Amino acid sequence: LLVKELFEVQRYPDLRESPGGAPDLPYDVTGWTLPLQMGVEVAPVTEPLSADVRRKARIIERVAPPAGSVDGAGTVFVFDNRANAAVRAVNRILKAGGSVSVANKELTVGSARFAPGSFVAGGISQDRAQALAGELGIKMTATKAVSDPVVPLKLPRVGVYSSWMASIDEGWTNWVLEQFEFVYTVLHNAEIQAGHLRESYDVLVFPDQNTSAIMEGHKVGTIPGEFVGGIGESGLANLKEFVRAGGTLLALGN
């Protein structure tokens, strides 16, 4: 039964308070269909396996990720952006002093074709590229140069807002950033209220939290003074100025 729950589609019931009324929305996760989450095709077996199939079947002792590789020769390395590990590769290359750009349009490198948005890296050795590809399980194609237009990337200066009111989403947000090897700074109300945010940050991330928790926080008298309040109107004005100055504001859950 657990396998069916994890591998088949869950269908949330059409619950309504009254006929024709608004649907009763779920408060939390509504599905956990692993094939949809992981992009894996699953075929149910509805009858016993034949003797021939059982004879050819083998036990999988361990699951190994796809092997990474670097094909071709050159000092420029092109790789697909769709693999999660590609983001880790980008951060590692930039931290090591290499360069990474994003392709504006489809690239053709030898016999390999790369969709728009693919990464183009340089400033690293063939050995370093091989090590990255092998460790992260990504496939790179080496070439001497890429003539098509690309947009250079840089390591973003990331700030993550932390309310004094507990936020589960903040913990998950920090965890995701750490898994993908982004460096970030935790910002509390005082830092947001101090302003001049664009001087220190390129991206501000606000984890999913209700408006009152962010704007007002804990009320006076309910908690020690240093943990009272939210970003307030002055903090909101500073966020608007940050965006006007070219900063990127990510409001998760909006």
Language model features with spans:
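Intrinsic-disorder/low-complexity accessory segments
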Residues: L1-N254
